[in-house]
């Protein structure tokens, strides 16, 4: 730590007051990214700041931790809570709060391990809020893949690194300038980001056709559906508990989404019978979990319709899936059902 950083921490210990260098979060900036950037601007590491405040070295912040950090960094606490992934429980199941809503799919948000676009960091200097979406594996601005590991040492990135664009090994982060994502992936990320932000519009002008019913679902549901369609390389491949509950690496998630998009092109119209070879590749448990745990009725109805289309091979009783209510008829029609 620099001498200036040591002095700042000593001051904080003697007189718990906001750090001297203060600034506002950038547009669409991640909460943890802002804390990392603000700590750096004050000459201390984020890890050291957590230590001196008596908080655990963890990106999972409690309500008390949020309040202490918001006061110390002098940022609005409500904004920090909005822009930070906060774990919790609902009906006995783990869930997350982020962007003012509840997320029930355990694979939707990165949380503990960040992913970044080094080109954005070099140009703008801030970690974006959208990068918290585990399925947002590409940068819409530069058309390149995001990274979650250091290209120099190979270690996974953490929120406790020295700066937003520097790994714990001390090297700056970078990405191959020739690496480009496919049109289909750009369309997917655009839709995911648009639905997560509530804008209802994709962040890309791609003409790639996604299933029309993607437009009305939450980003949480889109991630669960993509995982169910893409996690298996082939029919009946075993999916471990860890694979179904822990967000995969960015590279692994990219492969999952690429397979899912290929298979989902055959699911544009769910009124057409499901191909038998496709049915064998879908991991239905993720859809059942979405149907049982999600609070959003549109998302639950979508999961139910897909399960009915697949024939619900898992032995569960398809009759237990209720038909949509009158306010979900438009969605059900989009999915190929009868009103």
Segments and roles (model prediction):
Residues 1-339:
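Basic, alpha-helical nucleic-acid-binding regions used in initiation and control of genome expression
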